[in-house]
């Protein structure tokens, strides 16, 4: 049976459907998703916990976590210390898994339900920050994919691709991700298991070919001691944690198609197992490989270690990983544009966002240094993302993830979530306290805080602001929110 474009609502998209029902259900992926940042009715919630777990494994199966693991070695840690930093940094994924519960319980994406603690207008600032952060990650992911395609061009004989090659590689990498994101949630969920399996196998082959020569006693030439070692471990953990923190602002987006009665433990363990498991696996692989070679170029740096056929597969894994993650980032970024109150449908917002991402990637390729841009960007993610997430998650726990779906989409003073002049001062104040804590405790290439210097360079900006913002919001708004829940 052919699922034609007239029935799919997606011009030009035709899917082959076999006899089995499970393949027939795939044809629905051909239709462009019409939902945006609105409520998902129970009748349209098709997702299963198992699919959600594979989804998270897929979006985390990209080179970024491999690069972060290698970065821990580059900071001057020993092999064991770098592995510890990777594990500690990814421990924040427990919060990502827990916050995903909001998806099925509320049926809303993060930037809709966060109107409750920040106010309808106040939350637009968070939507703008979310979009800006997603633009940064799309740029990083896109660049990793572009480097892979350029390496493939070299293997195919195009030894000096120059500007035309860079532009072509950028269009290919971003183009595939954009098509998936514009199509929507179902297609995202369907393709991620294939990305996860292919990339996991390729990195396993890479590990098998390199593990025999890993320097298990790796120590830097000038190893720090005492508080210096602790400071470096926490700095590396902060870089690794930026990946988990970035998901805290979008985690319900992907889980909101789960039925509302999905058991909490299934949501938590599927997200944790799929997402954190893949992130730790790739991060530790990056640590091990970095003891053997310089990975400042994360694609070409692997070439001397492996046979030609495996290097080509590694290039493919980097390319696929860039697409797998960027597709999901483009998806949530489109929701963020809607949450800013720009009157566009989700797929149009995503298409607009794609043009801006294209400009950003080309700007880094031709103007700025990638490594410097990456470090500066990651150092700033932690300052805002953690406090924002802490407030909306604390608010959700206080109200038991119960929201008035009509009122939360009302954009005037009649909404129960309007606040004072459209702003919930309690939520903004709690987030500001957390951000202030982050600025006081950060130690990064871009910012060196006073308190971090007094602590020997220890970076606490990746978890302490979360604790502060959550505690302050519970103190300021706890009684009021619980009263709203009791009043119905």
Spans of model-derived segments:
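Membrane-water interface regions at transmembrane-helix termini and the short interhelical loops
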Residues: 73-75, 101, 117, 125, ...
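Hydrophobic transmembrane alpha-helices that form the core helical bundles
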Residues: 123-158, 322-339
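Juxtamembrane transmembrane-helix boundary signature
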Residues: 85-117, 128-142, 478
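Transmembrane alpha-helical segments of multi-pass small-molecule transport proteins
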Residues: 127, 155-183, 197-208, 240-251, ...
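Hydrophobic alpha-helical segments and their helix-loop junctions in multi-pass secondary transporters
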Residues: 147-150, 155, 197-222, 240-245, ...
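Membrane-interface "cap" regions at the ends of multi-pass membrane proteins
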Residues: 16-79, 231-237, 256-264, 480-488
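Hydrophobic, membrane-embedded alpha-helices of multi-pass small-molecule transporters
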Residues: 47-65, 207-213, 223-289, 308-327, ...
């Amino acid at each position: 049976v052919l699922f034609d474009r007239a029935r799919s609502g997606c011009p030009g998209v035709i899917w082959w459907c076999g006899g089995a029902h499970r393949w027939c259900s795939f044809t629905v992926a051909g239709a462009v998703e019409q939902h945006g940042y609105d409520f998902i009715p129970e009748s349209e919630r098709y997702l299963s916990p198992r699919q959600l777990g594979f989804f998270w494994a897929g979006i985390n199966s990209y080179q970024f976590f491999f690069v972060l693991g290698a970065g821990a070695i580059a900071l001057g840690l020993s092999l064991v210390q770098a592995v510890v930093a990777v594990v500690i940094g990814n421990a924040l994924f427990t919060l990502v898994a827990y916050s995903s519960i909001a998806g099925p319980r509320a049926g809303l994406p993060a930037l809709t339900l966060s109107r409750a603690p920040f106010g309808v207008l106040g939350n637009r600032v968070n939507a703008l920050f979310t979009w800006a952060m997603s633009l940064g990650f799309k740029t990083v992911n896109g660049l990793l994919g572009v480097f892979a395609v350029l390496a493939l061009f070299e293997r195919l004989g195009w030894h000096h691709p120059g500007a035309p090659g860079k532009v072509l590689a950028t269009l290919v990498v971003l183009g595939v991700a954009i098509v998936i994101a514009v199509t929507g949630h179902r297609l995202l969920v369907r393709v991620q298991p294939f990305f996860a399996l292919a990339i996991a196998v390729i990195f396993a082959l890479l590990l098998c070919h390199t593990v025999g020569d890993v320097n298990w006693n790796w120590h830097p030439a000038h190893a720090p001691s005492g508080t210096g070692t602790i400071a470096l471990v926490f700095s590396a953990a902060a870089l690794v944690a930026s990946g988990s923190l970035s998901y805290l602002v979008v985690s319900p987006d992907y889980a909101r198609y789960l039925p509302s009665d999905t058991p909490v433990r299934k949501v938590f363990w599927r997200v944790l197992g799929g997402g954190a498991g893949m992130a730790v696996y790739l991060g530790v692989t990056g640590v091990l490989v970095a003891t053997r070679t310089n990975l400042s170029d994360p694609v070409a740096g692997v070439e001397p270690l492996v046979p030609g056929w495996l290097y080509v597969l590694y290039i493919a894994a980097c390319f696929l990983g860039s697409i797998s993650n960027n597709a999901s980032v483009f998806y949530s970024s489109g929701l963020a544009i809607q949450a800013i109150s720009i009157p566009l449908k989700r797929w149009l917002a995503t298409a607009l966002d794609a043009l801006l991402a294209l400009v950003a990637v080309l700007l880094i390729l031709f103007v700025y240094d990638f490594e410097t841009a990456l470090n500066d960007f990651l150092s700033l993610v932690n300052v805002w993302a953690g406090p924002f997430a802490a407030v909306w998650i604390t608010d959700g726990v206080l109200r038991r993830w119960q929201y008035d779906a009509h009122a939360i989409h009302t954009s005037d003073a009649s909404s129960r979530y309007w606040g004072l002049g459209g702003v919930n001062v309690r939520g903004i104040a709690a987030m500001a306290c957390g951000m202030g804590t982050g600025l006081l405790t950060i130690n990064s290439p871009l910012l060196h805080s006073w308190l971090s210097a007094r602590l020997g360079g220890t970076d606490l900006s990746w978890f302490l602001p979360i604790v502060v913002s959550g505690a302050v919001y519970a103190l300021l708004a706890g009684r009021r929110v619980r009263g709203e829940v009791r009043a119905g």
